[in-house]
Each structure stands twice: as structure tokens, then as C-alpha cells.
Amino acid sequence: MKHALLVFTKVPKAGEVKTRLTEDRGGILTPEEANGFYESCVLDVIDTCLTVEGVDVWVCYNKDGNRADLDGLLQGVKGSEKIVGVFPDAGGSFDDCMQYATDYILKNGAEDRLADAVTILGGDLPSLQRKTIEEAISKLDRLSKLSATGAALVQGACQEGGFSLVGLTTSTPFDFHKVFYNMDGITALDMLVNKVVEENIPFGTVEMMPDVDIPVDLASILPLLRALEAAQKNDPSVTVPRRTMEKFKEIGLETFAFPPHRDEIG
């Protein structure tokens, strides 16, 4: 089975990415700092994807994004020549954009499809591990053999009932309609699972990967990245997002936990 990895991202631009991390939206970063963080994170994610063997790596960016700026940014990726293709989404809701990107690669199973399975990742996953991607691909291969049609779907959850990774085969009866935007108050992950159960799709999960959208996410991810850095000294299979960590140091971000009040102990 031919696999594609698709990094789904906005073109980084100050004031347009990670705005909920900025002071104007109640956050702690300037627009330039938030943009610098996102740039670093996207490059780290793509770097990690490019270390996975036997897959094609694609990048899908927002329709209104500046392609020249993105091309310039991608020159900073080690092995950028390995990126098979870069294309814009078609606009619309996030559901629409995800569906367009999926169809662009899988082409509804047509002979001119670009892959037999696609795994989509966000650009804001600082703790992304190569072994997590490899596990998702392996599970897609295994699960697809459980169905006469080759259908299979794998997801990796993130905070607040969302997911940060989703992979599916070209014959999987799944679409993103109402997954991220619905009027019923159903979380994205719940909606995904509802569709999987309804269609009886062979289904698997990989480890949770937090994204970074709001200040509390920063407070959570910083200790995790330090833990990854320490773990890599004894386990070279651990992926450390060097650019993102350097950016955090440049900004001067540190975590702090208030000690509990005495009457809250015991």
C-alpha cells in the first residue's frame, strides 16, 4: 500500500496564526512571537515526517496563504527536496479544507490517485514522534486487511475532544462533513468515532499528541519537551523539536506551578 503523509498548515504570518496565544486575545505572546513559534513548530513537524521511510510527504496550506513565503520557509527544512508536493486547500470551513486535502491525495480511489492511504497531521504538534507516525501507518496496513474493501481509519487524539492525526485508506467510507463544525455540540473526536461506528470501519488509535492553541497549552507542552530532550540522551529514537525549543528559549518562556495552600494539603 502506498502511503502519503500530509502536513496541514496555515502559511505563518504574524497576526494570522496562533492568535489565541497573543496578548490581544488574552494570551502572553506578541503576534511576532506567536508567529515565530508556529514557524518553528511547522518546520519541526515536517522534519519529523521526512524521517519516516517509504512514504510521500505533502504539504497543504491555506488558500489565502502566500505560496512564496511558504516556499521560502520550507527551504529551512532538512531534505526539503523530499517533499513530493505543496498545494493550497480550496477554502471554506475546516471540514471542507480537510475533505479537499484528502480527496486531492486519494481521489476517491481513482486510478490516478496519489496514494492508497493518507495520514494527515497538523503543523502545531511540537511533541510529534516519528514512531507515532510509523505506528499509525502500520495500523492502517493491518486494519485494512480486516475489511473486504480495504477500509481502515486511525486517529491520534488531542485536548478538548479533538484529534491531531487522522489516517484513512482510499476505500474508507468516511468524510469530514460536520466533524469540526456542527450545531449539535458534538466534539470532533466524538463525531469521528460516530461515523466510524456507523459505517463499521476497522479503527485504531495512536498516542495522544497535544497541539498548542491557548496559553495553558504552552504551560503543558514546555515540561513535555524538556522530558523528551532528557529521554533522547538514552533513547535515540525519541524525536526532539529543536527549533521549537530554541524559540521558547529565545522568547524566554518558562513554566511555574503555584504551591498548594496549606489547607489544601491532606
Predicted stretch roles:
Residues 125-160:
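Conserved donor-nucleotide/metal-binding helix-loop-beta segment in metal-dependent transferases, i.e.
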Residues 187-266:
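Conserved alpha/beta core of the MobA/IspD/sugar-nucleotide pyrophosphorylase nucleotidyltransferase superfamily
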Residues 36-55:
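A short, N-terminal amphipathic alpha-helix
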Residues 54-63:
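Short beta-strand/loop segment that forms part of the nucleotide-sugar
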Residues 1-23:
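N-terminal nucleotide-binding beta1-loop-alpha1 segment
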Residues 173-192:
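Short, glycine-/small-residue-rich phosphate/pyrophosphate-handling segment
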Residues 117-121:
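Short aromatic-hydrophobic micro-motifs that form the base-stacking/packing surface
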